[in-house]
Amino acid sequence: MEIKTPSFRVETLDKSKTYHHHEYPQIILGLMGKSELSIEDSSVCLSPGMGYRINANVEHSFSGTSNNQVLVMNLPPFISMTDVEQFGNSYFSLDARTHQLISLLATELKEHADDSLLSQSISNTLQCLIKRSLMLFDEKKVERLNMVLIDNYIEQHLQKKISVAELSSVAFLAQSQFYALFKSQMGITPHQYVLRKRLDLAKQLIAERQKPLSQVAQLCGFSSQSSFSQAFRRLYGMSPTRYQFFIR
């Protein structure tokens, strides 16, 4: 399909993933709910106000939870090369005001799809807003991660699995960019950092002597007491049982 001008559509994504690619670039923007973009062995979580630029001929898939809505922008190759790909970030976010305005315009676009004049006016406005957002976001070069935000997210979700994709969404970065910046700043990988957070909490709970080790393992997000014991021993050189006895 040849695209000569940018085109927009509003979609609700289902839970299934179907990989595909096309000869034109795309920008996908979260409007409501939560969606996930899988691209080149990475996953990107798209919450409302978060967007991602997909280059032409790149294999990708979309999926979403219930009540999600995304705005899809198909781009002609010449616009992509001159007006979009000059910006380094594939992953970007909108400020609250711009997100609200784009959401309202997307609703109008969906409800009045048969009005060609209105649709063209809305499309032009959307194109300008998204281009401006890409420019503003690219100017905000991320040099250091906000570890307070990341730590807060980790602490609130320690009882479950925490993926790099989730943490990168908190930092408003693409997964690969977040991983490299995190390792450079902290000296360890995100996975190792989360594991240490789990084990730090485990030590604290064991010291309080109010919960059995099986419950400690569960509260700290380990799939089994065995995996908890192995991780604890690797980091601290003794088993949780031994540590429990040692601090009495």
Swiss-Prot record:
Keywords tagged on the record: DNA-binding, Transcription, Transcription regulation
One Pfam family named in its UniProt record: Cupin_2
Highest taxon listed in the record's lineage: Bacteria
Domain HTH araC/xylS-type: 148-246
InterPro entries for this protein: AraC_XylS_family_regulators, Cupin_2, Homeodomain-like_sf, HTH_AraC, HTH_AraC-typ_CS, RmlC-like_jellyroll, RmlC_Cupin_sf, Tscrpt_reg_AraC-type_HTH
One Gene Ontology term of the molecular function aspect: DNA-binding transcription factor activity
PROSITE patterns: HTH_ARAC_FAMILY_1 (PS00041), HTH_ARAC_FAMILY_2 (PS01124)
CDD domains from the UniProt entry: cupin_YobQ-like_N
Gene3D superfamilies linked to this entry: Homeodomain-like, Jelly Rolls
DNA-binding residues: 165-186, 213-236
Transmembrane segments: none
Function: Probable transcriptional regulator. Its target gene(s) is not yet known.
Protein name, UniProt field: Probable transcriptional regulator LumQ
Lineage: Bacteria, Pseudomonadati, Pseudomonadota, Gammaproteobacteria, Vibrionales
